[in-house]
UniProtKB/Swiss-Prot annotation:
Native species: Acinetobacter baylyi (strain ATCC 33305 / BD413 / ADP1)
The protein, known as: Flavin-dependent trigonelline monooxygenase, oxygenase component
EC number: 1.14.14.-
Gene Ontology CC entries for this record: cytosol
Annotated family: Belongs to the bacterial luciferase oxidoreductase family.
Keyword line: FAD, Flavoprotein, FMN, Monooxygenase, Oxidoreductase
Molecular function terms from GO: oxidoreductase activity, acting on paired donors, with incorporation or reduction of molecular oxygen, reduced flavin or flavoprotein as one donor, and incorporation of one atom of oxygen
Quaternary state and interactors: Homodimer. The trigonelline monooxygenase is composed of a reductase component TgnA and an oxygenase component TgnB.
Function (record text): Involved in the degradation of the pyridine ring of trigonelline (TG; N-methylnicotinate) into succinate and methylamine as carbon and nitrogen sources, respectively. Catalyzes the insertion of two oxygens, followed by a ring cleavage of trigonelline to yield (Z)-2-((N-methylformamido)methylene)-5-hydroxybutyrolactone (MFMB). It is able to use reduced FMN or FAD.
Pfam families: Bac_luciferase
Enzymatic reactions: N-methylnicotinate + FMNH2 + O2 = (Z)-2-((N-methylformamido)methylene)-5-hydroxybutanolactone + FMN + H(+); N-methylnicotinate + FADH2 + O2 = (Z)-2-((N-methylformamido)methylene)-5-hydroxybutanolactone + FAD + H(+)
C-alpha cells in the first residue's frame, strides 16, 4: 500500500492571512514529496474559507514547479461546476506543465452551499448525473473530433486543446460511496476514492465491499485501484493523541455545520460555534474521533493501516485538514513519514530528506 497527502488551505477565523495559509500548504506538500509519498491531492471548493480551493489545477501547476517526484491529483474537481471542453483542456494543460504527473479525481460535490451559488436549483442527484455524463465526454475530447449530445451539454465536433501528455489520458478517479457510484467507476475504467468521514472501520469495510462487488460484476474489465482517505494524526504520546481527538471534534462540528448549510456566513466564514454547541453533537465527540479516525502513536497507526492494506486498499491518503496549527500538522506528517511509512514495503521512503527545510 502506498501513501499520499490530502491537503487544502483551511480557515475557521481571520487570524491567519490567506497568503500564510498557502505558504504553509506548499511546505507540507514539499515535506510529502521529499519524504517519499506517492501523491498529493487537493480539491475544489468555492466561496468557503473553511476549504479554500477555487481551482486545483492552479495549485497543481504551482506544485509541479515546487516538487520533484510526487504525482499531483485533483481531490476532487466538482463535475457540475465545469463544462467538458474546459475541464478537458485545463486538465491536459496541467498534465503537460507537470510533465505527466497529473491524476484527476472527479466528484459530484457535497455542499448545498456551493450548489446554490454555482448551479442554482441543482440537487445531489442531478450533480451525480452530470458526473456520469462528464467522464465519457472528457475521455472522448482527449481522443479528438468528438461531438456530444447529452442531457446537460451539447457541442459539435471538438478536440481538446491541448491533449494530455499521458496517453490515452491521465488516470481518472471517481469519488464513490454507494454501490451505484462504485459500479459506474469500474465500468468506465476509473479508479475509486472513498472516505468514511467520521465513521469507523465498519464503514471502511463496507466501502471496500461495494468496490469488490463492482469488480465482480464487471469481471471483463481490469480491476482499477482504490484509495482510502482518512483524517490521520500520528502522535508522540497518548496525551498528544487525545489533544488531536479534541481538535478533530471541533473540525467535524464545523464540517457538519457547513454541510447542513443553516448557519450565517460572513466574509466566507461561518458563524462561530459555541462550546455548548460543539459539546452537544452526538456523533463528533472526542471519544468517537479517537476511536474512529486514525489517531495514535506510530505503532497504533501502523496496525490500523496494515488492516486496511489487508482489505485490499491500494493507497492510503493522509487527510491533514483538521483545524490544527501548522506546527502540529507538520509534526504529525513527519512522524508519518519517518515512523509509519517504513513499515510498508511499497512506500519507498527516503527518510533522510523528510524534515529538511524547503529548498525548491
Amino acid at each position: 500500500m502506498r501513501f499520499s497527502l490530502f491537503v487544502h488551505m483551511e480557515r475557521v477565523s481571520d487570524q491567519q492571512t490567506q497568503k500564510q495559509l498557502y505558504d504553509e500548504m506548499i511546505e507540507l506538500c514539499q515535506i510529502a514529496d521529499r519524504g517519499g509519498m506517492h501523491a498529493i491531492w487537493t480539491g475544489e471548493h468555492h466561496a468557503m474559507n473553511f476549504t479554500i480551493a477555487p481551482n486545483p489545477f492552479l495549485n497543481i501547476a504551482d506544485l509541479a514547479n515546487k516538487t520533484k517526484h510526487v504525482r499531483l491529483g485533483t481531490g476532487t474537481v466538482v463535475a457540475p461546476f465545469w463544462h467538458p471542453i474546459k475541464l478537458a483542456g485545463e486538465a491536459a494543460m496541467t498534465d503537460i506543465i507537470s510533465n505527466g504527473r497529473l491524476d484527476i479525481g472527479i466528484a459530484r460535490g457535497a455542499y448545498s452551499f456551493e450548489y446554490e451559488r454555482m448551479v442554482p436549483g441543482m440537487d445531489a442527484w442531478s450533480a451525480g448525473q452530470r458526473l456520469r455524463e462528464m467522464i465519457p465526454a472528457i475521455k472522448n475530447l482527449w481522443k479528438g473530433d468528438y461531438e456530444h449530445n447529452g442531457e446537460f451539454w451539447q457541442f459539435p465536433k471538438t478536440t481538446s486543446a491541448p491533449q494530455p501528455l499521458q496517453q490515452p489520458n491521465p488516470p481518472i478517479w471517481v469519488a464513490a460511496r454507494d454501490p451505484n457510484s462504485h459500479e459506474f467507476a469500474v465500468q468506465n475504467g476509473c479508479n475509486v476514492q472513498v472516505t468514511p468521514l467520521h465513521l469507523g472501520d465498519e464503514e471502511v469495510e463496507k466501502l471496500m465491499g461495494h468496490f469488490n462487488s463492482a469488480c465482480e460484476k464487471f469481471q471483463d474489465i481490469e480491476r482499477p485501484e482504490i484509495m482510502l482517505l482518512r483524517h490521520t494524526y500520528v502522535a508522540d504520546s497518548e496525551e498528544d493523541a487525545q489533544v488531536a481527538a479534541n481538535e478533530m471534534n471541533v473540525f467535524y462540528n464545523y464540517f457538519g455545520a457547513w454541510f447542513k448549510n443553516e448557519r450565517e456566513i460572513n466574509q466566507g466564514l461561518i458563524a462561530p460555534l459555541s462550546d455548548e454547541e460543539i459539546a452537544a453533537h452526538p456523533f463528533y465527540t472526542p471519544e468517537a474521533m479517537r476511536k474512529n479516525n486514525v489517531i495514535g502513536q506510530a505503532q497504533e497507526v501502523i496496525d490500523r493501516l496494515k488492516a486496511y492494506e489487508a482489505m485490499g486498499y491500494d493507497e492510503y491518503s493522509f487527510w491533514i485538514d483538521t483545524g490544527m496549527s501548522f506546527e502540529r500538522k507538520k509534526a504529525s506528517l513527519e512522524r508519518m513519514i519517518n515512523e509509519v511509512m517504513p513499515a510498508f514495503s511499497e512506500s519507498k521512503v527516503d527518510r533522510r530528506h523528510a524534515t529538511i527545510s524547503a529548498v525548491y
